[in-house]
Amino acid sequence: MTSTSDVYIEGTQDDPHRQAQIRLSKRNDQLLAKASSKAALLTELRLEPRDRQAAQAELAGFCADELLPYLDATDQALYAPAAGAAPTRLLVRALRIQHGIIAGSVVALDTASSADKARAAARSVVTTLAACLEIQNAVLVPALAELPGADLTLLAEDLETMLSGAQLEKPDEIDVRRIPHGERHPRIFGSYARLAPGESFVLVNNHDPKPLRREFDAAFPDQFEWNYLEAGPKRWRVRIGRLSAHTARCRTIGTRNP
């Protein structure tokens, strides 16, 4: 028998996906408000050198301790499941570019040697962050809610788990044979995002996962290993791993210089 707590109208306040969207939006709003208030000391006020340096150090510390870890957790929990799907692949790529711009601005902020440089870096952090979070709220999260195989409620819970400092489960084996074909890839990409460099898992499938390999090539070029352990006819087992930065760099150089 279905519990009345499980009955809801899609898109209403009782819809768990809608509730997850609201929670994620509030999280983003809180982060942006905190970053903006700290940056305003540098961008809106003309402070004495000692006060400016203190404000600069406080904003840089916030970025290192809260902002960048938040962006990293968001990438793992929300971006990775959408990284291979055709409707969201380019969107994720664009958001990751914005993350890179923010990270670069944080470095510029931390090393700024003048008020003008600190002001420019602080402004870049906030404006890029605002654009990134707006796209995430308005485009990516609604797309995740509709993406087959991606459960937005669980993804939001994964984000909260990482932000609390806990680690997400990393299964050694992912058997997708009982999962509908259209729902497999987001789950696999989400599991890959949890891997540290050098770690891997074994994918078990009932067909040769060549389409998945093409999605990995598009989303993570030269960043993963793909080794067949068993190749049919009824079962395929593939070890998928995240390469270390050194190995990935060597592979990239080898690809460019055959």
Language-model features, listed with the residues they occupy:
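Small-residue-biased structural context
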Residues: 1-258
